[in-house]
Amino acid sequence: MKLIRPLIFTMLAATALSAQAAQLPQSAELQYSGSYGIPATMTFTRSGNNYKIVSNIKVPLYSIRFESGGTIKGNTLVPSYYRDVRGGKTYAEAKLGGGRITYGKAGEEKTESISGTTQDLFTLAWQLAVNDGKLPAGLQITNGKKLYKVNGLARNGSASYSIAGGTTTINKYRLQRGDSTVNYAFAPALGNVPTQISYTDDGKTYDLQLKSIKINGKEVKP
């Protein structure tokens, strides 16, 4: 198998801030197959120390768009917002800044003080990728509707994964979010991008399996 040099871990810089920001790609487009074969796309874009993550999932009758954005500080992605948009309308949203978070379904927002780091599940996927499976200190998770404590992250072994006509090794992790479990997997030889994201929210199970990768506009294969 031809190993593709990881794009997330290849650049060095003089300062910690620029080094950590440079380890993320300028852009990434990840195509997934979801539950029942439903297509999903996640894009990551970076401009300087700002980032944006957009995940589009097509479900029966409507589409879901999860969007978050913020800044890169050291080795941490710091969201300033997260939106859950369904059928073109904002279903839930979180706004973060100044040690506070305003979150909730549309028309049901509330504000709380927060400390440590608060991320959504898609931002956390890239956080774990760039930080080699390590959680930021004091992490909480938001899905726009609620705020969850994280009860730990455990390595869950490695496996062979088929993608784009080849195979590669993935490293698996299990995260406890409140009373539910989130499963992640990453492919070190393919830029350590998220290859699997599986979780349940509002009674719906999302099981995303990576099918193709573009990093900085170029297709990446095993």
Predicted segments with their positions:
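Long, intrinsically disordered, low-complexity accessory segments associated with secretion
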Residues: Q26, L124-A125
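Bacterial N-terminal signal peptides that target proteins for export
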Residues: M1-I8
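Acidic, serine/threonine-rich low-complexity disordered tracts
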Residues: A22-G98, G133-P222
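Acidic/charged, solvent-exposed loop-and-adjacent secondary-structure segments enriched in E/D, K/R, S/T
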Residues: T102-L124
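Beta-strand/loop-rich accessory regions of lumenal/periplasmic or secreted enzymes
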Residues: W126-D132
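Absolute protein N-terminus
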Residues: M1, Q20-A22
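N-terminal signal peptide c-region/cleavage motif recognized by signal peptidases
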Residues: A14-S18
